[in-house]
Curated annotation (Swiss-Prot):
GO terms for cellular component: cytoplasm. Residues 18-91 form the S4 RNA-binding domain. InterPro entries: PsdUridine_synth_cat_dom_sf, PsdUridine_synth_RluA-like_CS, PsdUridine_synth_RluC/D, PsdUridine_synth_RsuA/RluA, RluA_PseudoU_synthase, S4_RNA-bd, S4_RNA-bd_sf. One of its GO terms (biological process) is enzyme-directed rRNA pseudouridine synthesis. The keyword Ribosomal protein does not apply. Belongs to the pseudouridine synthase RluA family. This is Ribosomal large subunit pseudouridine synthase D. It is found in: Cytoplasm. One of its GO terms (molecular function) is RNA binding. Pfam families: PseudoU_synth_2, S4. The active site is at residue 139. Its EC number is 5.4.99.23.
Amino acid sequence: MAQRVQLTATVSENQLGQRLDQALAEMFPDYSRSRIKEWILDQRVLVNGKLCDKPKEKVLGGEQVAINAEIEEEARFEPQDIPLDIVYEDEDIIVINKPRDLVVHPGAGNPDGTVLNALLHYYPPIADVPRAGIVHRLDKDTTGLMVVAKTVPAQTRLVESLQRREITREYEAVAIGHMTAGGTVDEPISRHPTKRTHMAVHPMGKPAVTHYRIMEHFRVHTRLRLRLETGRTHQIRVHMAHITHPLVGDPVYGGRPRPPKGASEAFISTLRKFDRQALHATMLRLYHPISGIEMEWHAPIPQDMVELIEVMRADFEEHKDEVDWL
């Protein structure tokens, strides 16, 4: 059942020059800026008694604003007692270190058992925030840092920061192949034309930019540090596969085991058992959505990646004399 929303207020003189959607988001902090933008586009907003359907229209201050809208009841998700590794928390945000095998948001094939269900149990008031405060995601088997908003104002500002590319996200990964230098992949990404659960580089896709640098060389693998400018689904995995260096263990984009010649049984066994993409969100830096203070968190790589890197490093040391690129 839809919930009726009727709001009235006067634009402050201090908001002179702001976009209408920005001004309304400040005036009505219980509603996200994206929701307010939808109401404007749907002609649910009156400014001085006249319909306004332009979110970018500038306000002068002193306007009388009335909103007459409806909110469709969102799907109700169950709180579930799923452990969360909380790296940081205050009144406005939570930063978690997500493990593997944990989906962020319920969807087809994963109706529950997600980060969202865990958040609803850990902090019940987050149910009043759209998507339980989730503003960005990690793939099911990608580990590492995520920030979650505990309030609507915090969520609105975090989303805006993401859109302005003010949030820095860095990852560690292990890629297949010997890479000679770091670089940037600037290639648009969209849904795969035939495999609907896959993504692909496509000229008609959304802009996507990934920067990478080399941390360590192994015989036929490379340890990387990567930084996202954009946050497309599967972005790092798609971009690395596109440049013919898919991530180790990636079941979707070509990361099948490729042990080097003469590898030890320990190396081969570890590589074959590594059944997820070797990708970890290791650093998150942002400006706090309410205080504006710059904050930064780090999460060390998980044990499965530690073991993978150790056997690759041992193999490299054992066969260093056979490597032709040193």
